[in-house]
Design a protein with these regions (language model features):
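Juxtamembrane/transmembrane-helix boundary motifs in multi-pass membrane proteins
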Residues: 2-10, 89-97, 118, 142, ...
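Transmembrane-helix signature of polytopic, membrane-embedded enzymes
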Residues: 113-132, 170
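Residue-level signature of transmembrane alpha-helical entry/exit and packing/kink sites
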Residues: 7-15, 98, 102, 123
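Membrane-water interface at transmembrane helix exits
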Residues: 26, 113-114, 162, 166
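Membrane-interface coil-to-helix junctions
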Residues: 22-112, 128-155
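Membrane-interface transmembrane helices that cradle and orient dolichyl/undecaprenyl
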Residues: 157-171
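Start-transfer (signal-anchor) and selected internal transmembrane alpha helices
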Residues: 1-25
């Protein structure tokens, strides 16, 4: 397998460009401002008991009475000690929220289009069109972060499926 440093350099610059686009679009986050996300405000109330327990006991509670009359906390941000995928996810989402989700949208769709053997210039345009599609921006505004997170990873999942069926185990 021959490594093409020019192509790697181009893709690296594109990824840097996507990070820059995400930061520029959400530039108020650089000043510490945050979007008022109604669902996140509601989450804060539901997760208060869990967060108080974590702070007081330095341990996790996997049950809360603060949501729906009692429920497991896995949907409210319970932390698990050996969740290495979460650590990888946090490394990929190095930008402040919500710019991190926009970056994931752009990166994931760019990779999908490259896997589909689309020219990188067209892939850039496709990624920008996908990332800035109306719905994907709207869900960030109301706090549907878990949905945005799942949608952002779907192009990468599809890329992996396509590569597996093509028996191409490396990009």
């Amino acid at each position: 397998m021959k490594i093409n440093l020019k192509q790697i350099g181009i893709h690296f610059l594109v990824i840097l460009g996507f990070a820059l686009v995400a930061i520029l679009y959400f530039n108020p986050v650089l000043n510490g401002k945050k979007i008022y996300q109604s669902d996140i405000v509601q989450y804060t109330g539901m997760a208060k008991q869990q967060l108080d327990f974590r702070k007081a006991n330095d341990a996790e509670s996997y049950w809360t009475n603060g949501a729906f009359g009692g429920m497991p906390t896995y949907q409210l941000g319970a932390k698990y000690p050996h969740n290495y995928i979460k650590k990888l996810d946090l490394a990929i989402r190095f930008l402040p929220r919500p710019a991190d989700y926009l970056f994931l949208y752009l990166l994931g769709f760019y990779v999908l289009l490259l896997v589909l053997k689309i020219d990188y210039k067209v892939a850039i345009l496709g990624a920008l069109a996908f990332g800035f599609s109306t719905y994907l921006i709207i869900i960030l505004g109301v706090g549907h972060n878990a949905k945005a997170h799942a949608i952002a990873y779907m192009p990468l999942v599809l890329s992996g499926i396509i590569l597996t069926f093509q028996k191409r185990y490396c990009l």
